[in-house]
Amino acid sequence: MRQLLEASPVNDPFGYPVLYVDLRDERRALLFDLGDIGALPPRKLLRVSHVFVSHTHMDHFAGFDQFLRVVLGRKEGIVLLGGPGFVDQVEHKLRAYTWNVVHRYSV
């Protein structure tokens, strides 16, 4: 039997929660929560098509800024999904930046 996906926790059980799911045949991946993503190399982050955030406590959302830096400017869009109020919270994070050096990107 061929394995279609591989789910891997990014951190140890006591670290910030992040689950990376590689959809092998589709050449893309899913992220569940954005805690500490420092252990994921950029090549893996660039495969992510969807991010599912359970809630925006710091331990589940602290990696958002790092994720944004890696994927900003790529051609493919990314779907961010979260609970009630999530869109407003992401909007506030994006508005907190000064965007004068990224004028060529659509955010």
Regions found by a protein language model. Name each.
Residues 1-107:
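Binuclear metal-dependent hydrolase catalytic cores
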